[in-house]
């Protein structure tokens, strides 16, 4: 019953904002044209909620859907309750999760998605759909009450996955950082999503979308 599209990033190579995702989203939301998307802008640290909402509305105008940010509601959960689809944008995962807790959205999002409401998210919005945010790439610039995330997907997500070390970088590679996580959490699975890829989860099955496959690390 669950139907989710977890996108690694909002851009791929030289494409515009969310441009590479449009064909995927058109297919994913084919039965929802004219319906309402509740958009969660909490991860967007460097822009206002109004600005983030407008950016996403413009980028996804070809979907023919009404995109409304949760901050438009008297209570943010009001917009979630009324929506046909839920979307969470990218940015800082710690800020995102903190505000999901502050506005009491964890349970209502989980309930709606478990009952069949389509969910899509990119970057932080993909990361927070997993079991916890412990495999985010972001700096902990604020502290949520828990690292436990929406748990719509029972495993870990690592968006923006890059294999190997960049030239001149002497710190740990992404594989090494994720290997550290798995040493401390040996029963976990990490789904690493390279740029330009997505994971479609439907009826308990996960399918790759995009030119690059995801990696499952354990």
From Swiss-Prot:
One of its GO terms (biological process) is proteolysis. It is found in: Cytoplasm. It catalyses: Dipeptidase E catalyzes the hydrolysis of dipeptides Asp-|-Xaa. It does not act on peptides with N-terminal Glu, Asn or Gln, nor does it cleave isoaspartyl peptides. The keyword Hydrolase applies. GO terms for molecular function: dipeptidase activity; serine-type peptidase activity. It comes from the Bacteria. SUPFAM superfamilies: Class I glutamine amidotransferase-like. Hydrolyzes dipeptides containing N-terminal aspartate residues. May play a role in allowing the cell to use peptide aspartate to spare carbon otherwise required for the synthesis of the aspartate family of amino acids. NCBIfam families: PRK05282.1 (NF003642). This is Peptidase E. The lineage of its organism: Bacteria, Pseudomonadati, Pseudomonadota, Gammaproteobacteria, Pasteurellales.
């Amino acid at each position: 019953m669950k139907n989710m599209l977890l996108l690694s990033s909002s851009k791929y190579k030289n494409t515009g904002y969310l441009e590479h995702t449009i064909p995927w989203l058109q297919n994913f939301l084919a039965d929802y044209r004219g319906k309402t998307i509740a958009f969660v802008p909490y991860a967007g640290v460097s822009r206002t909620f109004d600005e983030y909402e407008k950016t996403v509305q413009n980028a996804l105008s070809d979907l023919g859907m009404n995109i409304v940010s949760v901050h438009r509601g008297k209570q943010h959960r009001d917009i979630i309750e009324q929506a046909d689809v839920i979307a969470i944008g990218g940015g800082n995962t710690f800020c995102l999760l903190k505000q999901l807790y502050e506005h009491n959205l964890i349970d209502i999002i989980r309930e709606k998605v478990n009952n069949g409401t389509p969910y899509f998210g990119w970057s932080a919005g993909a990361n927070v759909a997993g079991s916890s945010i412990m495999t985010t790439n972001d700096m902990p610039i604020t502290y949520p009450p828990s690292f436990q995330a929406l748990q719509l997907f029972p495993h870990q997500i690592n968006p923006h996955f890059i294999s190997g070390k960049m030239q001149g970088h002497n710190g740990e590679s992404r594989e090494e950082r994720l290997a550290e996580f798995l040493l401390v959490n040996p029963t976990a699975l990490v789904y690493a999503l390279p740029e330009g890829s997505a994971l479609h989860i439907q009826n308990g099955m996960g399918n790759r979308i995009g030119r690059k496959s995801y990696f499952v690390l354990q």
